[in-house]
């Protein structure tokens, strides 16, 4: 399996601009089918504590972008997104993994929040270490 890491200068809290940057990089990279593409934590917004403004549902625009990217290129796509909370709770800093058909394969909510950066004041920590198989290889997502 090929693994590709995508690092770029994120446009602060501007999802469409960041989607366009990822699209351009992937088009240029010409990744082989089945590649695992790794996008940064909160790649569509930057590491923002403005959770209420940037949070979206698990089927929101960033998840749709990732699913479409995976299906269009026949690759796995893993990236960070802020997911809206249930009523009365804080949003979660999550990573979503889509398979080459664009289906959500796994999701993980960051467990160890970055307290010095104020993350714990704005986000709800995750509780589970979502394990999954990728090409018969046991894997686990982590967000630093």
Feature locations, PLM:
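Active-site catalytic loop in hydrolytic enzyme cores
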Residues: 56, 86-144
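Extreme N-terminal starter segment of soluble prokaryotic enzymes
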Residues: 1-5
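Cys-nucleophile CN-hydrolase/nitrilase-fold catalytic domain and related Cys-dependent amidase chemistry
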Residues: 15, 23-101, 107
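Hydrophobic positions in the central parallel beta-sheet of the AAA+
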Residues: 6, 37, 140-142
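Conserved protein kinase catalytic core
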Residues: 13, 47, 113-116
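Short polar catalytic/cofactor-binding loops
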Residues: 7-12
């Amino acid at each position: 399996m090929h693994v590709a890491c995508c690092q770029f200068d994120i446009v602060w809290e501007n999802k469409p601009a960041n989607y366009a940057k990822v699209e351009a990089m992937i088009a240029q990279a010409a990744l082989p089918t089945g590649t695992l593409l790794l996008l940064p934590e909160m790649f569509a917004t930057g590491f923002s504590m403005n959770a209420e403004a940037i949070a979206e549902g698990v089927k929101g625009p960033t998840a749709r972008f990732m699913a479409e990217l995976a299906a269009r290129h026949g690759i796995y796509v893993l990236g960070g997104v802020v997911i809206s909370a249930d009523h009365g709770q804080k949003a979660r800093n999550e990573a979503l993994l889509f398979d080459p058909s664009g289906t959500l394969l796994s999701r993980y909510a960051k467990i160890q929040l970055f307290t010095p950066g104020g993350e714990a004041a704005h986000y709800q920590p995750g509780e589970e270490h979502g394990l999954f198989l990728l090409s018969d290889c046991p894997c686990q997502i982590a967000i630093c």
